[in-house]
UniProtKB/Swiss-Prot annotation:
Keywords: Ribonucleoprotein, Ribosomal protein, RNA-binding, rRNA-binding. The keyword RNA-binding applies. This is Large ribosomal subunit protein uL15. SUPFAM superfamilies: Ribosomal proteins L15p and L18e.
Length: 154
């Protein structure tokens, strides 16, 4: 026995159909393409979205909205995630990234009020919800909003 003499089991491999090789092959003359028409000709095939000259679906649908080039996206941090830091720590976007709480700094950090803050820390953030600001003050912590439009300290 030799690797060069191995053959597949009889009936396990089906031979490919030889198209357009005479009527005795079973796929002669039109080679399974039907009669005349664009799809019976050789060359480039039609794209999937082609609808025979009818106005395509994607062009029939109305355009809507636009992409705002000055859109700001904030990294979201919840209050319960801030319990990871020790008392007296100053928490900023870079320290949140080092701690693995956020992946990217984006346009800044936004603090939301999910959970409860148990530590006394100073938080530097671009934005914070009103409920989050109230919870932070209630816990004895401090939040400093670092955007131009916000007050320098709340």
């Amino acid at each position: 026995m030799d690797l060069s003499t191995l053959k597949p089991v009889a009936g396990s491999r089906k031979s490919s159909t030889r198209k357009a090789r005479g009527f005795s092959a079973g796929k002669g003359k039109t080679a399974g393409r039907g009669q005349k028409g664009q799809k019976a000709r050789e060359g480039k095939k039609l794209r999937l979205s082609f609808e025979g000259g009818q106005m395509p679906l994607m062009r029939r649908m109305p355009k809507r909205g636009f992409n705002n080039i000055s859109r700001k996206e904030y990294a979201i941090v919840n209050l319960d995630q801030l319990n990871k830091f020790d008392d007296g720590t100053t928490v900023s976007a870079s320290s949140l990234k080092e701690a693995g709480i956020i992946k990217k700094e984006l346009s800044g950090v936004k603090v939301l009020a999910s959970g409860k803050l148990n530590k006394k820390i100073t938080i530097h953030a671009a934005k914070a919800s009103q409920a989050a600001q109230d919870s932070i003050k209630e816990a004895g912590s401090k939040i400093i909003l670092t955007t131009e439009t916000a007050d320098s300290e709340n």
